[in-house]
């Protein structure tokens, strides 16, 4: 069975790895503000694993901060993540839980943790070379990646199409959602 993958941030990176591993099944990628993991030198592998182990243990010990009301929690998310209030409010709908009279952000702390293993530049190139389908990458001009660096690196991959948009890392949850949806309908086959 063939399929299209769409991913945001780490989900975008994982989509590339899956497409490279299943090149006959994945027929298209739509990636939002993500493409590849930031490469590391191979000699940093042990240090990276150490960070992963440390980060993996930390969430289980950390006491989460409770908020008196929803607005207080949303305001902190706006400040901490530099998000518009409407996007932080959408995140709150999904991720705020009321427990014993206080609001808590309920997210998987492992999303903030270091990866167990990181890929080298050569690994990234090998994975991209194994992808056998068009890749559409929506890049937020205020997003996480270094657009110019990735665009320069990817010029040797003609099946990668860049779509730079105004917006932040979570632009797919904001006004640009319609533009991204239009892009999907234009390019998915």
Give the residues covered by each predicted segment.
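Active-site loop/turn elements of alpha/beta-hydrolase fold enzymes
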Residues: 34, 142, 167
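Conserved hydrolase catalytic core segment
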Residues: 1-45
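Conserved alpha/beta-hydrolase catalytic His-Asp/Glu region
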Residues: 62-118
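A catalytic-pocket lid/entrance helix-loop region that shapes and gates access to the active site
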Residues: 32-66
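Conserved beta-strand scaffold positions in the cores of enzyme catalytic domains, especially
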Residues: 137, 162-164
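Conserved serine/cysteine hydrolase catalytic core
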Residues: 98-155
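C-terminal alpha-helix
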Residues: 183-187
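Catalytic histidine-centered segment of alpha/beta-hydrolase-like enzymes
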Residues: 165-177, 181
């Amino acid at each position: 069975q063939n399929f299209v993958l769409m991913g945001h941030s780490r989900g975008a990176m994982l989509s590339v790895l899956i497409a490279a591993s299943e090149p006959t099944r994945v027929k298209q990628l739509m990636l939002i503000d993500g493409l590849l993991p930031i490469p590391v030198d191979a000699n940093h592998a042990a240090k990276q694993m150490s960070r992963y182990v440390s980060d993996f243990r930390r969430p289980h010990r950390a006491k989460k901060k409770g908020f008196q009301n929803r607005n207080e929690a949303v305001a902190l998310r706006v400040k901490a993540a530099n998000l518009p209030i409407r996007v932080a409010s959408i995140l709150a709908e999904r991720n705020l839980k009321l427990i014993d009279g206080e609001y808590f952000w309920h997210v998987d702390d492992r999303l903030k943790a270091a990866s167990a293993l990181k890929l080298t530049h050569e690994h990234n190139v090998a994975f991209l070379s194994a992808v056998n389908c068009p890749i559409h990458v929506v890049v937020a001009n205020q997003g996480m990646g270094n657009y110019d660096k990735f665009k320069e690196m990817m010029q040797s991959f003609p099946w990668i199409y860049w779509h730079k948009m105004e917006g932040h890392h979570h632009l797919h949850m904001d006004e640009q959602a319609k533009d991204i949806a239009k892009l999907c309908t234009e390019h998915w086959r």
